[in-house]
């Protein structure tokens, strides 16, 4: 998607449709006047409430005028960035449905909107650009088109150009913000592509290749450990999960170093289980196809590092991705096995479907021992219990640092990728005690997301600034959340906003 930012008014530019952002206040006073000035019928406003994300189409009466179509997008009271995000996302989604090639956004009110929002014009522009990218997303790379009898090659498959029109004196700020938003949006969509790929199209080695490609785009160093190196490092958690697989595991390190001295060094760890059958503790057949999404944490980390690099943020960001699939076979790990992780801590495997924490344990150990970063954050589709607790729209947050937890919460609010903190009290550690090993990998039916976090806490080696984000719900929601089925790329915006907060 190409970006154009112009001072020209939206009513006079070349575009297939012009998006007009309308608030509930504007609906009463200004919307009719605006439509008349553009030569469109006010009748389109009849049933329009201007709620956030609501759309209605109007048409200009004079033929030959460009843009002919006016897409009114509701922004509610216009006092929250999230309302603008919903509006731009909905408009882009509609544009793709209508096969609109050039979509323009009327930004003539940007200065006033920013004032109402108590933000800068570039921040608003970043939200609009990122949301348009998000709404325009379609995952169709695996469709051959051979059965599509109505296919029209003359019409655009998606939005080819996004135009910010009527920018006036805000042109420079809007251009800077829109460019940043396009970067974050493209990275989030790249994460969605990875998560949407089925297991037969994405192995651990393929995921490592995706990290290499991100490194080329972002200009950062990528190192991939093969099974031999993983074995030398004694990453017993990753190797145990991989025992049932015919595909080798990988351990990928992405290292973005800013120019000059970094303000902080941030380690991001992402769970990369490319398909999770549950192993010997086999999952139910219903819904198992969605377990291609069990590497959503890894996809998020890969693309957050890329976004940080392309935005040239002044923090060092190191991503770690342990990756394998989790399959049943004659060689797979079995319930009751005791394994030794890289840290030397032994784990009783009560359930082979609690595998994500095993590979994360080794990754956290490696990150702490080899880099000792200022902050460690892991993201994982870790527990169904987190969905039971919080539903699909919100991620679970666990941290041993209240200041870090607060920063993540605020970034969640700002980015629209919300997190909610759950406790890490010592009482929960009692639930993962083992009679035969140092720790058990499950804690029973109750408090499953908390006991998983307590398990991970044992592998941070006393690090004082660690957070765990359980994205099981919002990464691939089956209810609520994204209006587009499949992967959401949840966590990319959250992490980018967090990294920017240290800038």
From Swiss-Prot:
Q: Which GO terms describe its cellular component?
A: cytoplasm
Residues that coordinate or bind Mn(2+) 2:
271, 276, 294, 355
GO BP annotations of the record are: proteolysis
Q: How is the cofactor bound?
A: Binds 2 manganese ions per subunit.
A GO molecular function annotation here is: manganese ion binding
- UniProt KW Protease keyword: yes
Binding of Mn(2+) 1 occurs at 276, 353, 355
The principal location of this protein is cytoplasm
Q: Where in the cell is it found?
A: Cytoplasm
Q: Which residues form the active site?
A: 283, 357
User: What top-level branch of life does the organism fall under?
Assistant: Bacteria
Q: What class of enzyme is it?
A: hydrolase
Q: Which keywords does this Swiss-Prot/TrEMBL entry list?
A: Aminopeptidase, Cytoplasm, Hydrolase, Manganese, Metal-binding, Protease
Give the Enzyme Commission number: 3.4.11.1, 3.4.11.10
Needed cofactors, names only, are: Mn(2+)
Q: Name one Pfam family in it.
A: Peptidase_M17
The protein's annotated catalytic reaction(s) are: Release of an N-terminal amino acid, Xaa-|-Yaa-, in which Xaa is preferably Leu, but may be other amino acids including Pro although not Arg or Lys, and Yaa may be Pro. Amino acid amides and methyl esters are also readily hydrolyzed, but rates on arylamides are exceedingly low; Release of an N-terminal amino acid, preferentially leucine, but not glutamic or aspartic acids
- General function of this protein: Presumably involved in the processing and regular turnover of intracellular proteins. Catalyzes the removal of unsubstituted N-terminal amino acids from various peptides.
**HAMAP family recorded:** Cytosol_peptidase_M17
Similarity remark: Belongs to the peptidase M17 family.
PANTHER family named among the record's database cross-references: CYTOSOL AMINOPEPTIDASE, LEUCINE AMINOPEPTIDASE-RELATED
Descriptive protein name: Probable cytosol aminopeptidase
The species this protein belongs to is Chlorobaculum parvum (strain DSM 263 / NCIMB 8327) (Chlorobium vibrioforme subsp. thiosulfatophilum)
* Gene that this sequence comes from: pepA
């Amino acid at each position: 998607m190409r970006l154009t930012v112009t001072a020209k008014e939206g009513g006079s530019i070349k575009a297939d449709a012009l998006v007009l952002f309308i608030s509930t206040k504007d609906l009463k006073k200004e919307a009719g006047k605006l439509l008349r000035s553009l030569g469109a019928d006010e009748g389109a406003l009849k049933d329009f409430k201007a709620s956030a994300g609501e759309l209605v189409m109007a048409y200009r009466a004079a033929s030959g005028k460009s843009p002919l179509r006016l897409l009114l997008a509701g922004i509610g009271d216009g006092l929250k960035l999230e309302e603008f995000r919903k509006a731009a996302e909905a408009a882009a989604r509609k544009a793709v449905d209508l096969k609109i090639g050039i979509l323009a956004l009327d930004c003539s009110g940007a200065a006033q909107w920013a004032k109402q929002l108590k933000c800068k014009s570039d921040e608003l522009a970043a939200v609009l650009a990122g949301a348009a990218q998000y709404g325009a997303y379609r995952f169709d790379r695996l469709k051959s088109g051979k059965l599509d009898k109505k296919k029209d090659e003359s019409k655009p498959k998606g939005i080819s150009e996004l135009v910010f029109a009527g920018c006036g004196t805000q042109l420079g700020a809007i251009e800077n913000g829109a460019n940043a938003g396009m970067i974050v949006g493209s990275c989030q969509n790249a994460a969605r592509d990875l998560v949407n790929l089925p297991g037969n199209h994405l192995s651990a080695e393929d995921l490592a290749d995706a990290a290499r490609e991100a490194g080329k785009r972002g200009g950062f160093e990528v190192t991939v450990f093969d099974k031999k190196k993983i074995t030398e490092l004694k990453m017993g958690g990753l190797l145990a999960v991989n025992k049932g697989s015919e595909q080798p595991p990988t351990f990928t390190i992405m290292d973005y170093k800013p120019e000059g001295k970094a303000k902080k060094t941030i380690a991001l760890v992402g769970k990369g289980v490319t398909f999770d059958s549950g192993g010997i503790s086999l999952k139910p057949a219903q819904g198992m196809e969605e377990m291609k999404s069990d590497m959503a944490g890894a996809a998020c980390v890969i693309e957050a590092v890329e976004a940080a690099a392309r935005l040239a943020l002044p923090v060092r960001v190191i991503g770690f991705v342990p990756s394998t699939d989790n399959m049943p076979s004659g060689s797979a790990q079995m319930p009751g096995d005791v394994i030794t992780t890289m840290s030397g801590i032994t784990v009783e495997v009560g359930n082979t479907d609690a595998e994500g924490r095993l590979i994360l344990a080794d990754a956290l150990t490696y990150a702490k021992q080899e880099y000792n970063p200022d902050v460690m954050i892991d993201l994982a589709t870790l527990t169904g219990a987190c969905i039971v607790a919080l539903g699909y729209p919100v991620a679970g947050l666990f941290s041993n640092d209240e200041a870090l937890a607060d920063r993540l919460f605020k970034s969640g609010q700002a980015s629209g990728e919300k997190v909610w903190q759950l406790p890490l009290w010592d009482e929960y550690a009692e639930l993962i005690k083992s009679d035969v090993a140092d720790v058990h990998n499950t804690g029973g039916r109750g408090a499953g997301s908390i006991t998983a976090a307590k398990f991970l806490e044992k592998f941070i080696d006393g690090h004082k600034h660690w957070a765990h984000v359980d994205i099981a719900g919002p990464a691939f929601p089956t209810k609520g959340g994204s209006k587009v089925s499949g992967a959401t790329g949840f966590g990319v915006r959250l992490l980018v906003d967090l990294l920017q907060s240290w800038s």
